[in-house]
């Protein structure tokens, strides 16, 4: 009788543990809050854009990033950024200093490495240059021809800078080691465990 009760209690404990740890999630709001905090504490975050022939040498300072999660196409992370871009542009043999506000938008997937969540496979969907000066027009024309290089620079940046770290409490830290899959849903990231 006692053995039966012990087995029943052990089975119940295992069931409760497994059902409580089947998945964990991070909401879009939590993700955006973490990104905003990271941008505040780790500035300046600069993405360098340089062409081999040195016609362009720009630094992109990330001021703001807003993340929108969607289930579309198997799960996407859509990011709208506000940045300041500054540097030099060589036009007709003349170096021209420039500064403008650049607002790129892109979509990507996610990967987890240890306890860090990274954006992967960033694909630009839109780039807006704010302003209407001559240098802004030249920047628009130059960026149009630099689409692939700009996309690669964004992808490289987010491949090494996590957007979220699973370290907010002991349960999150422990669960991070057991994540087997990530599912992007509308408004949350689900971490599948076991």
Regions from the PLM with identified roles:
Residues 1-9:
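Bacterial N-terminal signal peptides that target proteins for export
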Residues 21-194:
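Extracellular/lumenal and peripheral-membrane lipid-interaction modules
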């Amino acid at each position: 009788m006692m053995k039966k009760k012990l087995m029943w209690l052990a089975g119940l404990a295992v069931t409760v543990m497994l059902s409580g740890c089947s998945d964990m999630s991070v909401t879009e709001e939590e993700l955006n809050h973490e990104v905003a905090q990271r941008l505040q504490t780790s500035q300046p975050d600069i993405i360098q854009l340089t062409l081999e022939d040195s016609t362009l040498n720009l630094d992109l300072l990330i001021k703001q990033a807003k993340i929108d999660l969607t289930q579309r196409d198997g799960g996407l992370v859509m990011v709208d950024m506000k940045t300041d871009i500054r540097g030099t542009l060589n036009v007709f043999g003349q170096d021209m200093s420039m500064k403008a506000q650049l607002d790129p938008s892109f979509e990507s997937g996610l990967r987890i490495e240890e306890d860090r969540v990274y954006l992967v496979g960033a694909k630009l969907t839109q780039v807006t240059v704010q302003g209407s000066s001559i240098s802004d027009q030249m920047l628009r024309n130059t960026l149009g021809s630099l689409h692939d290089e700009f996309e690669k620079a964004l992808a490289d940046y987010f491949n090494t800078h996590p957007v979220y770290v699973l370290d907010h409490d002991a349960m999150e830290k422990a669960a991070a080691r057991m994540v087997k899959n990530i599912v992007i849903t509308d408004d949350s990231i689900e971490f599948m465990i076991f």
